[in-house]
């Protein structure tokens, strides 16, 4: 009883102390509370060849630092970062960015945002325990900027929409953004009066335009005093399929002024460009071909430059590869007959009865493997659903992306009739249509292997359907090694199948320099010699020159490039090429890299 009375008296005293004692005396002593450091203002230069979005993305990707309250101009970028992030951001000093190198420095003295932070800090009541968030400060700073505009945000957006409406021609899908400084409506808005609002005007204009005029195909940016396209780089993001663009009567001086749009992904469809009235036109006044070549290298589909058609040779050089595009290749007519006959029977058996095919055409010691390439470059032919049905192939693929260990990879190399038969039966049903030879490429040549002797290597590029998957199309590459033997006269000892997303057959359509192809219809029986298309004259010439190059390589030890150059400079005469080589070698003027 006495103990309970003592406890009640003590509790009453403690309550009285809590009520009477000031707040600061009631707090128990401990570690001082951590205070948040104010944000740091920075200035970034060396960014002029990239856009504001490019810079923000680059910094976040490299060091995971967010740039806030950004003021962007071609000369410099000012921004604010968290105090704890500055050291990471400073690590990007000298980093390569858009063809230049970034320079980052801390600004001495408090920025507007830092001052806002400190004012907020001094106004804290004793009950506040945390500093205002950086996002709140950035929002406040943005409000301060918006106060320079005479209209509210909604009113500004509406007036920008009205301005664009007066400049847009819906019949031709043409938007005239020329001479913006002299536009009465923009002058009335005051949006171009100060640098702080002027730098943000064009991105805002593009945002409004993208929402109201998404189908624009032609734009004029003439008479805007542009020294580079950095300030208007968001145009390419707004209309990436733009066809016609005028930059006439600006101050673009060099090719580097166009670099923000130089990546071929920025304006890939651009067909006409006007630069008349810019200093760069004077720079290339006597070099018309170089001028066109430089512009086409930046805009691959360009066909008109300053009203002049692009030279056909320049267009051709952009769409060709160093070597001609070939279709099917066979070292001998006999090889072509064997391969055509074999592949017709092979794909027929693969589509209809794989188990019987394996027992009939595969060697008892044959190996079979699958590799899935689900990340190949997709084209307009690719189907949206093709990546959703890779499961059966992933389970068998030896691709390192789908094989978790060496043991698992080894288990997916199938050997002998039983393993191969079980593997191929688990794959989706297919249908190979061999009637259209333009959809296929067959290569075949003879070789001698130490372990098995004479063999033929076959490489196939083509496509097939999966009838059970709504006739889904796939592209594939297949490499087969065949030997004479078995009941059919041919045995497969190695079969490698690579499956890809459907990409069509444009990759091997013949160009002007391509060699002949065999258009023989595929059938189960071999073609007759009279049906074989005879080589064209240009094919014979290519074969002869190739033989000369190979002989020079064997005789001199030159690599492919220098051997070809040696033959070409001597008009493809073997004796002259060899004599020229010996003379140059005696004078010790052939570089070492010619033999690497």
Curated annotation (Swiss-Prot):
Molecular-function annotations in GO: RNA binding
Top-level taxon: Eukaryota
All copies of domain NTF2, residue ranges: 338-499
Coiled-coil segments: none
Record domain LRRCT: where: 283-338
UniProt record, GO biological process: poly(A)+ mRNA export from nucleus; ribosomal large subunit export from nucleus; tRNA export from nucleus
One CC-aspect GO term: nucleus
Domain free text: The leucine-rich repeats and the NTF2-domain are essential for the export of mRNA from the nucleus.
Function according to Swiss-Prot or TrEMBL: Involved in the export of mRNA from the nucleus to the cytoplasm.
Subunit-structure text: Interacts with mlo3 and rae1.
Protein name: mRNA export factor mex67
Species annotation: Schizosaccharomyces pombe (strain 972 / ATCC 24843)
Gene: mex67
């Amino acid at each position: 009883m006495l103990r309970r009375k003592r406890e009640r008296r003590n509790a009453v005293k403690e309550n009285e102390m809590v009520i009477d004692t000031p707040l600061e005396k009631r707090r128990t002593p401990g570690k001082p509370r951590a205070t948040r450091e104010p944000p740091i203002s920075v200035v970034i230069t060396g960014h002029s060849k990239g856009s504001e979005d490019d810079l923000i993305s680059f910094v976040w990707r490299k060091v995971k630092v967010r740039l806030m309250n950004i003021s962007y101009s071609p000369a410099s970028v000012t921004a604010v970062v968290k105090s704890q992030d500055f050291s990471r951001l400073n690590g990007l000093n000298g980093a390569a960015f858009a063809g230049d190198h970034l320079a980052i420095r801390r600004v001495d003295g408090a920025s507007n945002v830092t001052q806002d932070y400190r004012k907020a800090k001094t106004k804290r009541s004793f009950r506040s325990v945390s500093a205002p968030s950086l996002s709140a400060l950035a929002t406040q700073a943005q409000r301060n900027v918006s106060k320079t505009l005479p209209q509210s945000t909604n009113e500004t957006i509406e007036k920008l929409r009205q301005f664009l409406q007066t400049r847009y021609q819906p019949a031709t899908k043409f938007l005239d953004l020329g001479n913006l400084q002299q536009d009465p409506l923009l002058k009335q808005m005051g949006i171009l009066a100060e640098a702080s609002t002027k730098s943000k005007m064009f991105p805002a204009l593009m945002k409004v335009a993208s929402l109201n005029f998404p189908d624009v195909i032609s734009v004029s940016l003439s008479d805007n005093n542009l020294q580079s396209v950095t300030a208007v780089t968001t145009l390419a993001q707004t209309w990436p399929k733009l066809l016609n663009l005028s930059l006439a009567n600006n101050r673009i001086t060099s090719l580097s002024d166009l670099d923000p749009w130089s990546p071929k992904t920025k304006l890939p469809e651009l067909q006409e460009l006007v630069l008349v009235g810019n200093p760069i036109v004077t720079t290339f006044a006597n070099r018309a071909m170089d001028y066109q070549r430089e512009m086409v290298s930046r805009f691959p589909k360009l066909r008109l430059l300053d009203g002049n058609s692009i030279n056909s040779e320049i267009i051709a050089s952009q769409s060709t590869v160093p070597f001609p595009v070939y279709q099917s290749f066979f070292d001998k007519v006999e090889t072509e007959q064997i391969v055509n006959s074999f592949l017709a029977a092979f794909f027929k058996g693969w589509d209809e009865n794989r188990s019987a095919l394996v027992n009939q055409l595969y060697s008892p010691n044959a190996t079979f493997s699958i590799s899935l390439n689900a990340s190949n470059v997709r084209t307009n032919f690719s189907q949206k659903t093709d990546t959703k049905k890779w499961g059966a192939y992933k389970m068998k693929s030896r691709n390192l992306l789908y094989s978790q260990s060496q043991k698992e990879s080894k288990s997916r190399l199938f050997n002998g009739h039983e393993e191969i038969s079980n593997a191929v039966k688990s794959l989706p049903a297919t249908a190979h249509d061999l009637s259209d030879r333009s959809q296929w490429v067959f290569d075949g040549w003879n070789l001698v292997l130490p372990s098995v002797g004479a063999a033929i290597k076959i490489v196939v590029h083509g496509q097939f359907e999966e009838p059970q998957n709504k006739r889904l199309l796939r592209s594939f590459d297949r490499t087969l090694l065949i030997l004479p033997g078995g009941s059919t006269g041919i045995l497969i000892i190695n079969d490698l199948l690579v499956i890809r997303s459907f990409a069509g057959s444009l990759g091997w359509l013949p160009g002007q320099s391509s060699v002949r192809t065999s258009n023989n219809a595929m059938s189960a029986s071999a073609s007759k010699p009279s049906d074989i298309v005879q080589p064209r004259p240009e094919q014979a010439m290519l074969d002869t020159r190739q033989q000369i190059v190979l002989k020079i390589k064997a005789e001199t030890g030159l690599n492919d490039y220098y051997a070809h150059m040696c033959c070409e400079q001597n008009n493809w005469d073997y004796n002259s090429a060899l004599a020229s080589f010996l003379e140059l070698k005696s004078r010790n003027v052939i570089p070492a890299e010619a033999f690497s």
